[in-house]
Amino acid sequence: MAKQEYKQLPKRSEVHSTTEQFKDTVKTSLGLDLFKGLGLTIKEFFSPSVTIHYPMEQLPLSPRYRAVHHLQRLLDSGSERCIGCGLCEKICTSNCIRIITHKGEDNRKKIDSYTINLGRCIYCGLCAEVCPELAIVMGNRFENASTQRSQYGSKSEFLTSEQDAKNCSHAEFLGFGAVSPNYNERMQATPLDYVQELSKEESKEETPTSPESHKGDENV
């Protein structure tokens, strides 16, 4: 551990007479310390302002910002992406997602109710990561104040407009929960991939020769 060296400041002499007190006051008031403080104040006064006058002004948010959720639709058709698998409900650490489904005539799940309790949600984004259909994503709407509790968490609050999906006025989501454009290049092989490659090589080596090759050997 480095040795710390302390510098002892000279002890200030005590002032007794009125004349000495007056001189000390003038020296302290008009000394360099006063001008140093004023210099810093003047420097910050003329520096560019960094204050944002919210809500009239807002800073641009990152595409991967995690705020109120969006339920996506398929482009062109406008159909809902959600297939009712319930993975988002299972992985939710806050236990704030509720999905009620039933089996339709085509033996596929139909969604009766999809709610998110925004009062409990911690906006971790796990639901967006686990969704196989990219149906639920994290949006950038953080202004969700309301006077009525019933306005929090309804499906109509999160679902993308069907008209916007059919007109392709909104692009595929590129924020938190979306697939990266270069995910193939960034994907790394897992230990299971190496095991599969070894099993394929072993199966090729153990493949028996065809009967025709044995006949050819006998003729020779």
From Swiss-Prot:
It is a peripheral membrane protein. Residues 198-220 have a biased composition (Basic and acidic residues). Its EC number is 7.1.1.-. GO terms for biological process: aerobic respiration. This is NADH-quinone oxidoreductase subunit I. Belongs to the complex I 23 kDa subunit family. It is found in: Cell inner membrane. The gene is nuoI. Keywords: 4Fe-4S, Cell inner membrane, Cell membrane, Iron, Iron-sulfur, Membrane, Metal-binding, NAD, Quinone, Repeat, Translocase, Ubiquinone. InterPro entries: 4Fe4S_Fe-S-bd, 4Fe4S_Fe_S_CS, NADH_quinone_OxRdtase_chainI. NDH-1 is composed of 14 different subunits. Subunits NuoA, H, J, K, L, M, N constitute the membrane sector of the complex. GO terms for cellular component: plasma membrane. PROSITE patterns: 4FE4S_FER_1, 4FE4S_FER_2. Pfam families: Fer4_7. Its cofactor is [4Fe-4S] cluster. Binds 2 [4Fe-4S] clusters per subunit. Residues 190-220 are annotated as: Disordered. [4Fe-4S] cluster 1 binds at C82, C85, C88, C131. SUPFAM superfamilies: 4Fe-4S ferredoxins. Its main location: membrane. [4Fe-4S] cluster 2 binds at C92, C121, C124, C127. Residues 71-102, 112-141 form the 4Fe-4S ferredoxin-type domain.
